[in-house]
């Protein structure tokens, strides 16, 4: 599956539109399934080097995702519907927020110390978000005439570091940024949930019905 897509000038397919409209609901279902598995299961890698590696990767992923989303919010807050943002993180790829989401989602999966749960979250993202990217590219191309040129030189998903550029000063819409702040740090909240489940398991408050690979 190639997430780095060409500019989506054509109208999105019915499936693309469905996934875009219902992505929050779909994610709630996926996350709920993962949480149920985490509550009722236990990592088979517990107290091994694999567990330590997964936890380290998870913490790095969540930290990078949180910082990255805050960086994106500085540039996009208050501008999303009024102008095409092409500097800062948006100079390296067209959808840096989704890049951060992917890194954070995989990080959260790794923090469960289960390769299976991390893979489920990564697969759900890979199946859903190419459609979301196509739909958003189509909308941006309709709203901003300069988008087509921007899309030709800027990858959709995988950042190209050599393209980075930014102004020496940048006006931040503080009110919009503050409203986006909660969305940018929700990974930290989910980290607390995952850690709380692990603490409850070590305290023998939760049953274990299955070992999670």
Curated annotation (Swiss-Prot):
Record has Membrane as a keyword: yes
Keyword Cell inner membrane found: yes
GO cellular component: plasma membrane
Pfam families in the cross-refs: ICMT
GO BP of this protein: response to cadmium ion
Residues annotated as transmembrane: 24-44, 48-68, 113-133, 180-200
Localization of this protein: Cell inner membrane
Main location: membrane
UniProt family annotation: To A.eutrophus CzcN.
Protein name as catalogued: Nickel-cobalt-cadmium resistance protein NccN
Lineage of the species this protein comes from: Bacteria, Pseudomonadati, Pseudomonadota, Betaproteobacteria, Burkholderiales
